[in-house]
From Swiss-Prot:
Identification of the protein by name: Crossover junction endodeoxyribonuclease RuvC
Keyword Cell membrane assigned: no
Domain of life: Bacteria
Cofactor details (free text): Binds 2 Mg(2+) ion per subunit.
Any one GO cellular component localisation term in the record: Holliday junction resolvase complex
Protein purpose: The RuvA-RuvB-RuvC complex processes Holliday junction (HJ) DNA during genetic recombination and DNA repair. Endonuclease that resolves HJ intermediates. Cleaves cruciform DNA by making single-stranded nicks across the HJ at symmetrical positions within the homologous arms, yielding a 5'-phosphate and a 3'-hydroxyl group; requires a central core of homology in the junction. The consensus cleavage sequence is 5'-(A/T)TT(C/G)-3'. Cleavage occurs on the 3'-side of the TT dinucleotide at the point of strand exchange.
Encoding gene per record: ruvC
GO molecular function, one term: crossover junction DNA endonuclease activity
Catalytic activity from the UniProt record: Endonucleolytic cleavage at a junction such as a reciprocal single-stranded crossover between two homologous DNA duplexes (Holliday junction)
InterPro entries cross-referenced by the UniProt entry: RNaseH-like_sf, RNaseH_sf, X-over_junc_endoDNase_RuvC
Keyword NAD tagged: no
Primary site of residence: cytoplasm
Length: 161
C-alpha cells in the first residue's frame, strides 16, 4: 500500500510544500514547491492566496495525509504571529478538504530523519536527498520546500504502515 504525504512548512511570505509517496520503508519523491506571497498584498489576500494554492496542491496530488510544522518558541514575536496566521489558513484548508493532518516540531523532524534533533539545514537537505534517492546535486525549489519534504518523511517515519 502506498501512502501519499503532503508536508507543509508554513509561513506568511513563503509556504514550502513537498509531496512524497511511502511504500513500506521506501520513500519516493513526487514534487516540491513554494507558495510566495508579497508584503504589498493585504493580509486577507496573502492568506487567501496560500489557501487557494494549498487547495490546488491537494486537488492535483490527492495526498492521503498532511504534516505541518508546529509553532515553536520564536524570539521574533511578529514572525511567530505571521506564521500562526498562515498555519491557521492552512489548517482550515485541510479541514475544508477533509484532509487529516499531523503536527511536528522542528526538533521532532530533525530527530526523525537523522536521529539527532540539532542538525543544520545543509545536513537536513543531505539526508533528504539520500532518503529520497536523489542525486547529490538535486536542487530543491527552496529551503522551505526541502523542510516540507522533511516534514513528510517525519510523518512517514512516525506512522509506519
Amino acid at each position: 500500500m502506498i501512502m501519499r504525504i503532503l508536508g507543509i512548512d508554513p509561513g506568511l511570505a513563503n509556504v514550502g510544500w513537498g509531496i512524497l509517496d511511502r511504500k513500506g520503508s521506501k520513500y519516493m519523491y513526487v514534487q516540491d514547491g513554494t507558495v510566495i506571497t508579497h508584503p504589498f498584498m493585504s493580509l486577507k489576500d496573502r492568506l487567501k492566496l496560500i489557501s487557494d494554492e494549498i487547495i490546488l496542491i491537494i486537488d492535483n496530488f490527492k495526498p492521503d495525509v498532511a504534516s505541518i510544522e508546529n509553532i515553536y518558541f520564536a524570539k521574533n514575536k511578529k514572525t511567530a504571529i505571521s506564521v500562526s496566521e498562515a498555519r491557521g489558513a492552512i489548517i482550515l484548508t485541510f479541514a475544508l478538504k477533509n484532509l487529516d493532518f499531523y503536527e511536528y516540531t522542528p526538533i521532532q523532524v530533525k530527530n526523525s530523519i537523522s536521529g539527532f534533533g540539532r542538525i543544520e539545514k545543509v545536513q537536513v537537505k543531505y539526508v533528504i536527498r539520500i532518503l529520497l534517492g536523489m542525486k547529490p546535486d538535486f536542487i530543491f525549489t527552496s529551503d522551505h520546500s526541502s523542510d516540507a519534504l522533511a516534514l513528510a518523511i517525519c510523518h512517514g517515519n512516525y506512522h509506519i504502515l
